[in-house]
Amino acid sequence: MFLAAAVQMRSGNDRAANEARALELLGQAAGRGALLIGLPEMWEHIGPAREKHAFAGPVDGAQLARIREFCSKRAVWCLAGSIAELAQGPGGRSAEGSRIYNTTALISPRGEIVAAYRKLHLFDVDIPDGARYRESEQVAPGDAPPAAIETSLGVKIGLSVCYDLRFPELYRQIGADLLCVPAAFTAYTGKAHWEVLLRARAIENQAYVLAPAQVGRIGPANENRFAWEHACIVDPWGDVLADAGGEQEGIVVAPIHPARLSQVRRDLPALQHRRRDVL
């Protein structure tokens, strides 16, 4: 058994302030004994793409340096939410004005980036509450699904980002024991779907789900964009083990039992009953 923590934070367009707050919340989680701590989507910056280009770089560059240092010092695993990755072109250069990737990473207790994943599904939606989202105008989609990552925690971890949550085939293909969903889910869609989708992915895959989240307003004041909040952790039976609720920043912590995975999969062996010859 080990403890996992999901961070709930309110990111703005001041990257330095966001990083300081993220490290503070990571410290709180580690102080409570969490060995796996997840940051939300876009923890480092929420704002115009032109601002992201000022600091975006490769995933193993400066953006995650302090998070990696934290992991090494505190001997914890970290789901690094998502950052603005600027892909490198010929000669290590990036074309000016090129789109970024919305990239998550898993960092080991040695401070090593053991896996990274570029968000596949981009959120281009007009919300009935009046908010308009066109992620593809700023972000390029990834082109490869993530693989399950073996860890010293006794579970295989799978990576995804926010809107990926609506595509169940992605999680079935990963085949992980613990599914990570760092998010900035909208308040309008989150109220109806956030918990339902997280629980569904947990039940379908008989896996734990770790879902860090943004809280409050996301984006400029003149844009009607609010995050749903409710960072949470769900068990393989679909029970919500911890929920951060709304409005406030903070962390939630819950135990992850590898034995619980085995029990659920033994008692209801749905994964063994898949008709791979047909589907």
Regions found by a protein language model. Name each.
Residues 1-5:
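Extreme N-terminal starter segment of soluble prokaryotic enzymes
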Residues 8-14:
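Short polar catalytic/cofactor-binding loops
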Residues 15, 23-110, 116-118, 125, ...:
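Cys-nucleophile CN-hydrolase/nitrilase-fold catalytic domain and related Cys-dependent amidase chemistry
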Residues 59-79, 156, 161, 165-250:
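CN hydrolase (nitrilase-like) catalytic-core segments centered on the catalytic cysteine
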Residues 80-82, 102-106, 147-149, 231-233, ...:
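Short beta-strand scaffold segments in enzyme catalytic cores
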Residues 89-174, 187-196, 200, 267-270:
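Active-site catalytic loop in hydrolytic enzyme cores
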Residues 103, 115-119, 181, 243, ...:
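Residue-level detector of high-confidence beta-strand sites
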Residues 260-279:
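A conserved C-terminal secondary-structure "cap"
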